[in-house]
From Swiss-Prot:
This is Large ribosomal subunit protein uL3y. The gene is ARP2. It comes from the Eukaryota. GO terms for biological process: translation. Residues 1-36 are annotated as: Disordered.
Length: 390
């Protein structure tokens, strides 16, 4: 930037360094919403699988705006969220160096899809994970030991989290057999109530509508789509050099002065792009779809056409959404089938956008495999008429 007579911000943010591959495939919750002991006990996060995107039409509720009561078309993401199963509870104590886990109590019966998570190769293993621990629940001595650990949690711990896993076998579009295991913090009530609440959920299914509601703002944590090794122009957005540049033009011309005799970390360099851990905040829930209810279909108050939320031909590279789902405004991190962590928002929402009530008029169910024209197969058959097989 020598001899430049105007201000120019640098290309690319340094706030996301280092730009390297994420250490884990599943999004990690690094902060939970602030606890309020006066409220009843509740869970604060959930796991889902990204299915794909579609678009909706709705009326804007914004009094005073020119757009008030006008139709708008918006992109939405469908995240399939089958019920999670609670299998354990963890207690944390506060130390000068942060939270430290005191003890963990597991449920008696753990499914095979969860036990697969503790093996690198399930087929060649002895499949004995938790067999000794589950016998604790059958003997008097073991029950006393478990009860003493729970009492220790009530006495010393300040944070209680449950261990819950996804039901991966219900995800027919995924070939994976290992369930994803996650810690979910319990907020509300005192510590004793939290421990009792966690124990009451052991081996039970927790649906997504027990945590998130329609029109709520949530955060999405996940790992972005991987791009591999990329150059500086794609990775950092720096300007291409002139056409006649010697030895390449999609480069940084000068990577630093002679002294200091090293390359600064702030200089744009080629390297890994994508597969980064990211948190997207304030995504509005447009619909919570429940299996067996009208909300699972793409029907609305204005559009009574009987059609499923899955577009014609299924979501590309995913398939059919058969379980509960969340409809989120806008896009979300990761490719299709990627597991994403859904978390309640950290801050109290007061903006007009967050408080707006969403009334969907139309949900598109046309094929995503091209320029889809038809919402249902019956509509397509009616348009083309009777087909004659050769």
């Amino acid at each position: 930037m020598s001899h430049r007579k105007f201000e120019h911000p640098r290309h690319g943010s340094l706030g996301f360094l280092p730009r390297k591959r994420a250490s884990r495939h599943r999004g990690k919750v690094k902060a939970f919403p602030k606890d309020d002991p006066t409220k009843p006990c509740r869970l604060t996060s959930f796991l889902g699988y990204k299915a794909g995107m579609t678009h909706i039409v709705r009326d804007v509720e914004k009094p005073g705006s020119k757009l008030h009561k006008k139709e708008t078309c918006e992109a939405v993401t469908i995240i399939e969220t089958p019920p999670m199963v609670v299998v354990g509870v963890v207690g944390y104590v506060k130390t000068p160096r942060g939270l430290r886990s005191l003890c963990t109590v597991w449920a008696q019966h753990l499914s095979e899809e969860l036990r697969r998570r503790f093996y690198k190769n399930w087929a060649k293993s002895k499949k004995k994970a938790f067999t000794r621990y589950s016998k604790k629940h059958e003997t008097e001595e073991g029950k006393k030991d478990i009860q003493s650990q729970l009492e220790k949690m009530k006495k010393y711990c300040s944070v209680i989290r449950v261990l819950a896993h996804t039901q991966i076998r219900k995800m027919k579009g995924l070939k994976q057999k290992k369930a994803h295991l996650n810690e979910i913090q319990i907020n509300g009530g005192d510590i004793a109530k939290k421990v009792d609440y966690a124990c009451s959920l052991f081996e039970k299914q927790v649906p997504v509508d027990a945590i998130f509601q329609k029109d709520e703002m949530i955060d999405i944590i996940g790992v972005t789509k991987g791009k591999g090794y990329e150059g500086v122009v794609t990775r950092w957005g720096v300007t291409r050099l002139p056409r006649k540049t010697h030895r390449g033009l999609r480069k940084v011309a000068c990577i630093g002065a002679w002294h200091p005799a090293r390359v600064s970390y702030t200089v744009a360099r080629a390297g890994q792009n994508g597969y980064h851990h990211r948190t997207e905040m304030n995504k509005k829930v447009y619909r919570v779809g429940k299996v067996g209810q009208e909300t699972h279909s793409a029907m609305t108050e204005y559009d009574r056409t009987e059609k499923d939320i899955t577009p014609m031909g299924g979501f590309p590279h995913y398939g059919i959404v058969k379980e509960d789902y969340l409809m989120i405004k806008g896009c979300c991190v990761g490719p299709k089938k990627r597991v994403v962590t859904l978390r309640q928002t950290l801050l109290k929402q007061t903006s007009r956008l967050a408080m707006e009530e969403i009334k969907l008029k139309f949900i598109d169910a046309a094929s995503n495999g091209g320029h889809g024209r038809f919402q249902t197969s019956q509509e397509k058959a009616k348009f083309y008429g009777r087909t004659i097989k050769a």
